[in-house]
Amino acid sequence: FKKEIKFQNYVIFFSVIFYITIFTFVLPSLKYLFPSKIISDELKKLNYEELSVTGYHEPSLVFLAKGKIILSDPNEAAIFLAEGNNNLVLVEGRELDEFINSSSNLNLKLKKIREIKGFNYSKGQNIKILFFKVAK
Protein backbone atom coordinates (compact mmCIF):
# COMPACT_ATOMS: atom_id res chain seq x y z
CA PHE A 1 0.00 0.00 0.00
CA LYS A 2 2.88 2.41 0.81
CA LYS A 3 4.51 1.71 -2.58
CA GLU A 4 1.23 2.57 -4.31
CA ILE A 5 1.00 5.94 -2.53
CA LYS A 6 4.67 6.65 -3.25
CA PHE A 7 4.10 5.90 -6.96
CA GLN A 8 1.04 8.19 -7.05
CA ASN A 9 3.05 10.99 -5.46
CA TYR A 10 5.71 10.63 -8.17
CA VAL A 11 3.04 10.71 -10.88
CA ILE A 12 1.49 13.85 -9.40
CA PHE A 13 4.88 15.54 -8.97
CA PHE A 14 6.03 14.85 -12.54
CA SER A 15 2.62 15.80 -13.95
CA VAL A 16 2.84 19.19 -12.25
CA ILE A 17 6.38 19.71 -13.60
CA PHE A 18 5.22 18.67 -17.09
CA TYR A 19 2.25 21.07 -17.14
CA ILE A 20 4.26 23.96 -15.75
CA THR A 21 6.88 23.41 -18.46
CA ILE A 22 4.30 23.16 -21.26
CA PHE A 23 2.24 26.19 -20.24
CA THR A 24 5.18 28.38 -19.21
CA PHE A 25 7.74 27.67 -21.91
CA VAL A 26 6.43 25.62 -24.83
CA LEU A 27 3.03 27.13 -25.68
CA PRO A 28 4.06 30.80 -25.41
CA SER A 29 6.96 30.14 -27.78
CA LEU A 30 4.58 28.90 -30.48
CA LYS A 31 3.91 32.40 -31.81
CA TYR A 32 2.31 31.02 -34.97
CA LEU A 33 -0.71 30.04 -32.84
CA PHE A 34 -1.18 33.60 -31.58
CA PRO A 35 -1.50 35.86 -34.65
CA SER A 36 -3.10 38.69 -32.65
CA LYS A 37 0.01 38.86 -30.48
CA ILE A 38 2.26 38.90 -33.55
CA ILE A 39 0.16 41.71 -35.04
CA SER A 40 0.25 43.66 -31.78
CA ASP A 41 4.04 43.34 -31.59
CA GLU A 42 4.41 44.55 -35.19
CA LEU A 43 2.06 47.49 -34.61
CA LYS A 44 4.30 48.72 -31.80
CA LYS A 45 7.13 49.10 -34.33
CA LEU A 46 5.10 51.17 -36.80
CA ASN A 47 4.15 54.83 -36.99
CA TYR A 48 0.48 55.36 -37.85
CA GLU A 49 -2.48 57.47 -36.73
CA GLU A 50 -5.53 55.23 -37.09
CA LEU A 51 -5.94 51.50 -37.64
CA SER A 52 -8.51 49.43 -39.51
CA VAL A 53 -8.66 45.69 -40.10
CA THR A 54 -10.63 43.68 -42.61
CA GLY A 55 -11.14 39.94 -42.58
CA TYR A 56 -9.58 39.26 -39.17
CA HIS A 57 -12.06 40.41 -36.55
CA GLU A 58 -10.78 38.54 -33.51
CA PRO A 59 -11.61 39.86 -30.03
CA SER A 60 -8.01 39.22 -28.95
CA LEU A 61 -6.77 41.74 -31.53
CA VAL A 62 -9.29 44.35 -30.40
CA PHE A 63 -8.15 43.78 -26.81
CA LEU A 64 -4.44 44.00 -27.66
CA ALA A 65 -5.09 47.17 -29.70
CA LYS A 66 -6.86 48.59 -26.62
CA GLY A 67 -10.01 49.11 -28.67
CA LYS A 68 -8.29 51.62 -30.97
CA ILE A 69 -9.19 49.69 -34.10
CA ILE A 70 -11.93 49.85 -36.72
CA LEU A 71 -13.35 46.53 -37.92
CA SER A 72 -14.34 46.92 -41.56
CA ASP A 73 -15.00 45.19 -44.85
CA PRO A 74 -12.49 45.55 -47.74
CA ASN A 75 -14.31 48.49 -49.36
CA GLU A 76 -14.57 50.40 -46.06
CA ALA A 77 -10.89 49.69 -45.39
CA ALA A 78 -9.90 51.23 -48.74
CA ILE A 79 -12.02 54.33 -48.03
CA PHE A 80 -10.49 54.55 -44.54
CA LEU A 81 -7.01 54.45 -46.05
CA ALA A 82 -7.90 57.14 -48.61
CA GLU A 83 -9.33 59.51 -46.01
CA GLY A 84 -6.44 59.51 -43.55
CA ASN A 85 -2.99 61.04 -43.64
CA ASN A 86 -1.12 58.21 -41.98
CA ASN A 87 -3.66 55.43 -41.61
CA LEU A 88 -2.82 51.74 -41.54
CA VAL A 89 -4.99 48.89 -42.79
CA LEU A 90 -4.56 45.21 -41.97
CA VAL A 91 -6.00 42.88 -44.61
CA GLU A 92 -6.56 39.16 -44.14
CA GLY A 93 -5.39 37.25 -47.23
CA ARG A 94 -8.83 36.07 -48.36
CA GLU A 95 -10.02 39.70 -48.52
CA LEU A 96 -6.97 40.94 -50.42
CA ASP A 97 -8.40 40.90 -53.97
CA GLU A 98 -11.51 42.83 -52.97
CA PHE A 99 -9.41 45.34 -51.00
CA ILE A 100 -7.04 45.89 -53.94
CA ASN A 101 -9.98 46.35 -56.33
CA SER A 102 -11.61 48.88 -54.01
CA SER A 103 -8.30 50.71 -53.58
CA SER A 104 -7.80 50.78 -57.34
CA ASN A 105 -11.28 52.26 -57.83
CA LEU A 106 -10.23 55.06 -55.46
CA ASN A 107 -6.92 55.54 -57.36
CA LEU A 108 -4.93 54.62 -54.25
CA LYS A 109 -1.33 53.55 -54.60
CA LEU A 110 -0.72 50.98 -51.90
CA LYS A 111 2.47 50.23 -50.05
CA LYS A 112 2.73 46.88 -48.31
CA ILE A 113 4.47 47.46 -44.99
CA ARG A 114 4.46 44.00 -43.42
CA GLU A 115 3.10 40.50 -43.86
CA ILE A 116 2.61 37.99 -41.09
CA LYS A 117 1.38 34.41 -41.09
CA GLY A 118 -0.34 32.54 -38.32
CA PHE A 119 -3.00 30.04 -37.41
CA ASN A 120 -6.45 31.21 -36.36
CA TYR A 121 -7.28 28.36 -34.00
CA SER A 122 -10.80 29.67 -33.32
CA LYS A 123 -11.61 29.09 -37.01
CA GLY A 124 -9.11 26.30 -37.60
CA GLN A 125 -7.36 27.91 -40.56
CA ASN A 126 -4.03 29.33 -41.61
CA ILE A 127 -4.09 33.07 -42.13
CA LYS A 128 -1.97 35.73 -43.74
CA ILE A 129 -2.30 39.36 -42.64
CA LEU A 130 -0.90 42.15 -44.81
CA PHE A 131 -0.24 45.67 -43.52
CA PHE A 132 -0.92 48.52 -45.97
CA LYS A 133 -0.44 52.27 -46.09
CA VAL A 134 -0.87 54.72 -48.94
CA ALA A 135 2.34 55.01 -50.99
CA LYS A 136 3.75 58.53 -51.08
Question: Where on the chain are the PLM-derived regions?
Answer:
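Membrane-embedded architecture of ER/inner-membrane glycosylation machinery
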Residues: 1-136
